[in-house]
C-alpha cells in the first residue's frame, strides 16, 4: 500500500514547540490570538474542557486534545490537585494553505488508550517532561511531532474524519488517486487517468471523490498544485521553474490558475506574504 502521508509531510511539514509540563489547577484559559494550534496531553486528573457556549467536555482518563488551528478554550480542574499536562504549540508549514492542517477538524480528542502504537513515544515524552536532561526541549518537540503523525494515522485508520482530504485518504480506492496527485503533480492528470488510478469508472470516481473529499477531482488537483506553488514562491524560486514542477505548461497558465485559486497573481501574493511575515 502506498504511503498516504509521505508526500504530504515531505512538502508541508508540521512542527511542535513544548511550552508547558506539569500541573494545571483551577481555571486556565487559552485564547486564539497566536498564529498556531496546540496539542495537549492530559496524563492524569479530571478535566472539564470548555469552548465558548458549547457543551463542556469531561475528561477522566489520559487523553490528547489537538487544536490544529487557533481556537479559544478553557481547562477547569480541581483547585487543589489539578491535572498533569504536557502542552505544545503546533504549526503547519504554510498556515491556512497547509493541506494537512486544513483537512483536520477544529478539535480532536482521543483517549491515549486509542493510540497503542504510540505508547512507547508517550512514555518517553512523559519521562522527558519530568527530567532536566540536556536537550530536553528539542527532545520533547520532536516527540510531539511524532505524536502528531500518529494522530493523523489514527484519524485515517479509524475513520475519524468524515469529509475532506483525510477522509479521501482513508478510502481504499480514492487514496490511490490522491497519493498519485501528491507524488506527481506535474503529470497531465485527466479525470480518466485519476479514475484509472482508483480502479473506478469516471462517473463513479467523480461522484465518490466529491462526496468524500468535498471537491471535484479537478478542483482538488488545482488546490494541491497552487499550494505547492505558494511554498515554492516563499522559497524565492522562479515562476517559470515552478510552473513546470507543479504541472502547468507556462508561467501564464500558472498565473491564471493561481489567480483563480487565491484572487491574486503570484507576484501580488508573494509581496503580500512577505509583508505578513
Name these PLM-found stretches.
Residues 1-15, 26-30, 106-113, 131:
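A short, N-terminal "cap"/entry segment at the start of jelly-roll beta-barrel domains
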Residues 16-106:
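N-terminal regulatory/effector-sensing and dimerization cores
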Residues 45, 117-128, 176-184, 228, ...:
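Solvent-exposed, amphipathic alpha-helical segments
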Residues 99-123:
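Aromatic/histidine-rich interaction motifs
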Residues 107-116, 129-144, 148-187, 191-198, ...:
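Short, Lys/Arg-enriched, Trp-marked, Pro/Gly-tolerant hinge/linker segments that flank
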Residues 179, 183, 187-193, 200, ...:
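Terminal helix-turn-helix DNA-binding modules in bacterial transcription factors
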Amino acid at each position: 500500500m502506498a504511503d498516504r502521508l509521505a508526500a504530504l509531510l515531505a512538502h508541508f511539514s508540521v512542527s511542535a514547540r513544548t511550552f508547558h509540563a506539569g500541573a494545571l489547577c483551577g481555571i486556565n484559559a487559552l485564547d486564539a490570538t497566536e498564529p498556531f494550534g496546540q496539542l495537549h496531553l492530559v496524563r492524569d486528573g479530571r478535566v472539564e474542557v470548555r469552548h465558548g457556549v458549547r457543551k463542556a467536555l469531561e475528561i477522566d482518563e489520559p487523553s490528547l486534545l489537538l487544536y490544529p488551528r487557533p481556537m479559544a478554550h478553557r481547562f477547569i480542574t480541581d483547585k487543589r490537585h489539578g491535572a498533569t499536562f504536557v502542552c505544545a504549540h503546533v504549526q503547519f508549514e504554510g498556515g491556512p494553505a497547509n493541506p494537512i492542517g486544513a483537512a483536520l477538524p477544529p478539535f480532536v480528542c482521543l483517549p491515549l488508550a486509542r493510540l497503542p502504537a504510540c505508547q512507547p513515544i508517550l512514555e518517553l515524552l512523559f519521562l522527558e517532561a519530568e527530567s532536566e536532561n540536556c536537550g530536553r526541549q528539542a527532545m520533547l518537540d520532536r516527540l510531539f511531532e511524532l505524536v502528531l503523525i500518529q494522530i493523523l494515522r489514527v484519524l485515517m485508520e479509524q475513520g475519524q474524519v468524515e469529509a475532506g482530504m483525510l477522509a479521501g485518504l482513508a478510502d481504499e480506492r480514492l487514496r490511490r488517486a490522491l497519493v498519485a496527485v501528491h507524488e506527481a503533480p506535474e503529470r497531465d492528470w485527466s479525470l480518466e487517468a485519476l479514475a484509472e488510478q482508483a480502479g473506478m469508472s469516471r462517473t463513479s470516481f467523480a461522484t465518490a471523490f466529491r462526496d468524500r473529499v468535498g471537491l471535484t477531482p479537478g478542483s482538488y488537483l488545482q488546490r494541491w498544485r497552487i499550494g505547492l506553488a505558494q511554498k515554492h514562491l516563499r522559497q524565492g524560486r522562479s515562476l517559470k521553474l515552478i510552473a513546470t514542477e507543479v504541472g502547468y505548461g507556462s508561467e501564464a497558465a500558472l498565473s491564471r490558475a493561481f489567480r483563480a485559486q487565491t484572487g491574486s497573481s503570484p507576484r501580488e501574493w508573494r509581496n503580500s506574504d512577505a509583508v505578513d511575515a
